[in-house]
Amino acid sequence: MSYYFGFTPSVELSATIDKAYELIASKSSERYDVYRDKITQLTSKELMDALLIKLIESLPDDSERKAHLIKTAATIEATSDKLINTLLSPTKNEDVLPSFDFFDQKVLKNTQSGERRISVPLSDELAKNLLATIENVQAGKGLEEQQNLIRLFSELTKACLQHFLVDFTKTLNLNMLKRAAIPVTDGIIVKVIDIALRRLIPQMPQESLERFTKHYQALIFNN
């Protein structure tokens, strides 16, 4: 059994994935890179929503940092979009196939109940520590677990970025200049999210911590 962090794709993302694989299976001459690009852009947006936006939404409405952190999330999304637009370019169909192979083999996973998820593999240690910490929060020990939450969700962020920003982009034909931009952007996003976690979590009362961790608990699964 392997552990994953995974969110349910939107109807638009799921339909785009299905259409792309139908075209590939039928050896259609239609351009695959158009679908790769749309899938990549939607995945980036929906991953950010799962990782950070839900955390911000868990804050009390009168939180003094909530509005600022919403802007921070928008900055991260803009940074990601800029990198994606830099990396993606018109590509021959045969050269796009490695990206779809990666998605098929390492991203698309089903829960034990058969629900499709856009997924990131987690080490057993990280997954079990996350679940144990979440259970403690749900048991009323949120304040005691704040530092563990900050540390573990920082590790989760890094795992997601490693999977999509580093591993996935290895399937793209990039020149040295474009490839050099990846670790720079990775570092920026990690730093911004780490700062956000350190500002957000200590502000959250027990009720908010329970709501926030319940959301993430449902995103960790094994198969």
Spell out what each predicted region is.
Residues S2-N223:
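Protein-protein interaction and targeting regions used for scaffolding, dimerization, and localization
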